[in-house]
Amino acid sequence: MKIFSDFHHEGLYHSLHLLFEKRLGWELYRPIGLEWFKEGYWAINNQEDTARQFLEIGNEPKDDTIPLNDGHEKGDVYYIQDHHNHSWQKAITLETFKNTKFDVLLASIPQHIKPFQELIDKYQPQAKLIFQMGNHFDITGLPIKNLMASTAPFSFEGNKVFYHQEFDLGTFKPSGNPPEKMITSFINVLDKNGGMVNYYTLENIMPDYQFFSYGGQCRDGSVVGIENMARIMQNSAFGFHVKSGGDGFGHVIHNFMACGRPVIVNYSEYKNQLAGKLLIPDETCIVAEIGDDMSKVAEKIRSLTPLQYEWMCQRALDKFLEEVDYDKEERHIRKFLGDLT
């Protein structure tokens, strides 16, 4: 079975790699080449610089993020190295796509539903279209028959499955070592996020802790390699995720919890989202709404005894393992794929 997917989020795409290639034995492909953009089939936005970053072979990003198209061509396929997840992606040009038979096309943003349906109508009449929903998009009125959602469940009339995006639990796991006095953020472009003031205020009133801000355009730069990201999480006392807008899925929160580390989080943004199932105030997380008095958060952290903190870490891990079962979800996904319309 061959599946073609768009590519806009590295963590999401790697989760599709783990699902379709590693678990199901399918072949997963993504686009490469600016023809996708020029002919209207890549519609993340209308900026050519962004399109070049995602589609142009050998492109070097202008920010400090890692290149997305570093690889080589073999026959009609480009083999792209995923430096962060240490895997390889198969990418094809639009011309190769037209001459290859696919069973499924997967769109992961609403802007791609219409162009992907056009691709099916013109070149892949045998293929089925899946909409993979990783954020809380408004999909009212969109022509979606098959929904694969890594969000909190909601009402949908059609073929559907709700699941968690997979990541490597052999890497994101407890280290067995006590953490350092570190509080770490993995919020991209933190200085333009609503939680920025909370972060810098907490850092200012807690000089006994080291604060790190990782991600695109962040003070401490991007972290390359999931093993390095996991090590930083394992070494951190808390994750900082006071983020405006929240996340549909919430990779960072799930990663921290899998490592057995509690997070400082704006609970109101997440309580009704998928990651919210992991969050129990004062058990797996410390609540800090955007604009809150951060001195209260600092006091709560400082008042924890070693046993209380160790209990929070164990609760975080236990809650993750209670909510996330990739093997069980695989069975539901197989049924969903067998019922594609």
Feature map (PLM): residue ranges:
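Short hydrophobic beta-strand element within catalytic cores of glycosyltransferases
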Residues: 262-272
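Acidic donor-binding loop of glycosyltransferase active sites
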Residues: 231-248, 261
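Conserved active-site histidine-acidic residue motif and adjacent donor-binding/catalytic loop
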Residues: 215-233, 246
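N-terminal pre-catalytic "stem/leader" segment of glycosyltransferase-like enzymes
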Residues: 1-118, 123-128, 287, 326-339
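Short alpha-helical segment that forms part of, or immediately flanks, the ligand-binding pocket
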Residues: 230, 253-258
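Catalytic core of nucleotide-activated saccharide and alditol-phosphate transferases
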Residues: 96-201, 324, 328
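A charged, aromatic-enriched C-terminal amphipathic alpha-helix characteristic of glycosyltransferases
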Residues: 292-295, 306-341
